[in-house]
Amino acid sequence: STQPPSGRICRGVHRSVKDRRNESGIPVVNGSIYFDNRYLGKPLVFCGTGGLMPLELNGKPSWKKEAKAGDLIVMSGGRVGKDGIHGATFSSEELHEGSPVTAVQIGDAIVQKRMLDFILEARDKDLFNAITDNGAGGLSSSVGEMAQDTGGARVNLEKVPLKYQGLQPWEIFISEAQERMTLSVPKEKYEELKKIADIHEVEITIVGEYTNTGYLEIYYNDIRAAYLEMEFLHKGNPKYKLEAVWNYREKQPEKEFIPAEKSNLNHILLDMMGRVNIASKEDWVRQYDH
């Protein structure tokens, strides 16, 4: 196998969760670590987060968000680099020595924490109409999703802040990161939003505008890099037609464990407690910043 030893992977996953969440100020109350031989080739890490928010904000339902034509496309948080490119597709592929390193995001938990505080204050002051993260697909996903509300968008990629020079337009558009968000901001509210961002030391940049043209228009230094119909973008791909065969197997009843009379079960108990899926994980959990 080209995979690192399971122990190394396990320690790396735990360290990543511990460091990232502690530094970004998000409480981690627990966690579950389960071992199954069927996942030896590709371990899975699931992270679930629960958030609390008021039922209403500024007299409107807090859960409702809708970008409007004429709103500014504002990118906030971390800068764009070659890391995180094709991360969404990378997660669904077989891992091997030739897997692209650039698919892995190089995160910045401190930037994420500052951005979180900035967004909460901007939210309470009703300074944006909609917001979406730059996770899978980066700007292509966040802008493309919110442009459904308005029926189009125009993006100027040369305005996107970069970690370094040398990125192609398509790389700028799809690079993904968790500490980067896209906001739909009314033009008259941008200056106040910028003041709050400066207080929290968060970089925000106008990278385009939502339109109602029916097209997603992507430009780089006034050169058109992409011009896609919104209808095609969201509904143009053919759908898979999958077939499956169900091999029914009747569930066999579990054998009942009946110990011999007056037998000493201490060794059985110790063996059970020594199993990786039963043994206590308290030492690991206590390292999380509750």
Where would I find each of the regions flagged by the language model?
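Glycine/proline-enriched, intrinsically flexible loops and inter-domain linkers
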Residues: S1-H290
